[in-house]
Amino acid sequence: HLLQFEQLIRKIAGRGFRYYGFYGCYCGLGGQGRPQDATDRCCFVHDCC
């Protein structure tokens, strides 16, 4: 299932999941501050789950 998720991210975003591991303030481990853009906000919302 993780491979399918990677394929979905690549198809929609045009980049693999590794790109987002250190993206913005909230994509990847931890997070603090204000989300930098819509993608970072999505990671922020996910972190709040």
From Swiss-Prot:
Keywords: Calcium, Disulfide bond, Hemostasis impairing toxin, Hydrolase, Lipid degradation, Lipid metabolism, Metal-binding, Myotoxin, Platelet aggregation inhibiting toxin, Secreted, Toxin. This is Phospholipase A2 2. It is found in: Secreted. Pfam families: Phospholip_A2_1 (PF00068). Its EC number is 3.1.1.4. Belongs to the phospholipase A2 family. Group II subfamily. D49 sub-subfamily. Monomer. One of its GO terms (cellular component) is extracellular region. It catalyses: a 1,2-diacyl-sn-glycero-3-phosphocholine + H2O = a 1-acyl-sn-glycero-3-phosphocholine + a fatty acid + H(+). GO terms for biological process: arachidonate secretion; lipid catabolic process; negative regulation of T cell proliferation; phospholipid metabolic process. The active site is at H46. Ca(2+) binds at Y26, G28, G30, D47. Binds 1 Ca(2+) ion. Expressed by the venom gland. It comes from Lachesis muta muta. Disulfide bonds join C27-C43.
